């Protein structure tokens, strides 16, 4: 994977590009949380292309890209189009018709659950790379891994745009192999 990208802004490491286009929002969605708003990054054509290029190097050779709703699914769809693979959106509970497989987990700011279709996909034996926007506590990636493994999928790893290292999410989901494009 090349770490240096050339954009209209000149040459810069992918991590620097991500950092420059990430907006920190204090006390959102609740007091004490420092939210990473990646909207400016995703809206920038060159930056989004650089992110997808970097992720394509990481996810090459996988059968399926699984994105965690909502921003992880946005990135996963673009990545799957680039790789020529399928994409699966791991949805928040209540967004899919039954039957579904559900996995509960804890987030940095509360408990939640996620779902995938229970009977309309054949994932057994397929290699899957999980994509999300931010790795915080590891709750979301851990739940997505458990959910996919219940189907018989072979989770080859996860990739995130930003990793919040102080929250030690990587340690919480070990031994899952995690690739982060930038760390904060």
Curated annotation (Swiss-Prot):
EC number, as in UniProt: 2.4.2.7
Enzyme class, broadest EC rank: transferase
PANTHER family per record: ADENINE PHOSPHORIBOSYLTRANSFERASE
CC terms in the record's Gene Ontology section: cytoplasm
UniProt superkingdom: Bacteria
Family of the protein in this entry: Belongs to the purine/pyrimidine phosphoribosyltransferase family.
Catalytic activities: AMP + diphosphate = 5-phospho-alpha-D-ribose 1-diphosphate + adenine
GO process terms (BP): adenine salvage; AMP salvage; purine ribonucleoside salvage
HAMAP family reported for this sequence: Aden_phosphoribosyltr (MF_00004)
Cellular localization per UniProt: Cytoplasm
Subunit structure of this chain's protein: Homodimer.
Annotated Gene3D superfamilies: 3.40.50.2020
InterPro entries cross-referenced by the UniProt entry: Ade_phspho_trans, PRibTrfase_dom, PRTase-like, UPRTase/APRTase
Role played: Catalyzes a salvage reaction resulting in the formation of AMP, that is energically less costly than de novo synthesis.
Pfam families associated with the record: Pribosyltran (PF00156)
Pathway: Purine metabolism; AMP biosynthesis via salvage pathway; AMP from adenine: step 1/1
CDD domains, per database record: PRTases_typeI
Keyword field: Cytoplasm, Glycosyltransferase, Purine salvage, Transferase
GO MF, any single term: adenine binding
Protein name: Adenine phosphoribosyltransferase
Organism in which the protein naturally occurs: Mycobacterium ulcerans (strain Agy99)
